[in-house]
C-alpha cells in the first residue's frame, strides 16, 4: 500500500479550504484517508498553513511520500528544512565518530 501526504478539498464553492491528509494513493481525492495532519487555506493570509509537525515527521519517517503541492507547503512551513538539518547533523556526527576510530 503506497501512502501519500496530499490535499483533500473542502469548503464552499469558489472558496476552497484544503485538509492535509495521509491517504492511500489509490483512494479518491476526497475519499478515505488515514489521518488529518493539518489544513491549508489559500486565501488565508499569513496563518494559511496549520500543521501537526510531529505527525508529519512521523509519516515521512515511515515512508509516506508528499505530493508536489504538499512538499512546497511543507517547505514554506519550515518542516522540510528542519528535517534536512536534523538528518545532516546525524550524518555528520556519525562520520565524526567513525573517522577517529579508522585513523587509530
UniProtKB/Swiss-Prot annotation:
It holds the Pfam family Ribosomal_S16. InterPro entries: Ribosomal_bS16 (IPR000307), Ribosomal_bS16_dom_sf (IPR023803). Transmembrane segments: none annotated. GO terms for molecular function: structural constituent of ribosome. The keyword Glycosyltransferase does not apply. GO terms for cellular component: cytoplasm; small ribosomal subunit. HAMAP family: Ribosomal_bS16. PANTHER family: 30S RIBOSOMAL PROTEIN S16, SMALL RIBOSOMAL SUBUNIT PROTEIN BS16M. This is Small ribosomal subunit protein bS16.
Amino acid at each position: 500500500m503506497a501512502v501519500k501526504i496530499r490535499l483533500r478539498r473542502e469548503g464552499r464553492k469558489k472558496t476552497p479550504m484544503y485538509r492535509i491528509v495521509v491517504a492511500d494513493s489509490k483512494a479518491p481525492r476526497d475519499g478515505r484517508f488515514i489521518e488529518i495532519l493539518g489544513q491549508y487555506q489559500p486565501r488565508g493570509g499569513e496563518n494559511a498553513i496549520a500543521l501537526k509537525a510531529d505527525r508529519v515527521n512521523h509519516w515521512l519517517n515511515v515512508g509516506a511520500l508528499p505530493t508536489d503541492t504538499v512538499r512546497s507547503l511543507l517547505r514554506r512551513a519550515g518542516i522540510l528544512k528542519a528535517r534536512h538539518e536534523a538528518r545532516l547533523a546525524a550524518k555528520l556526527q556519525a562520520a565524526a565518530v567513525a573517522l577517529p576510530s579508522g585513523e587509530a
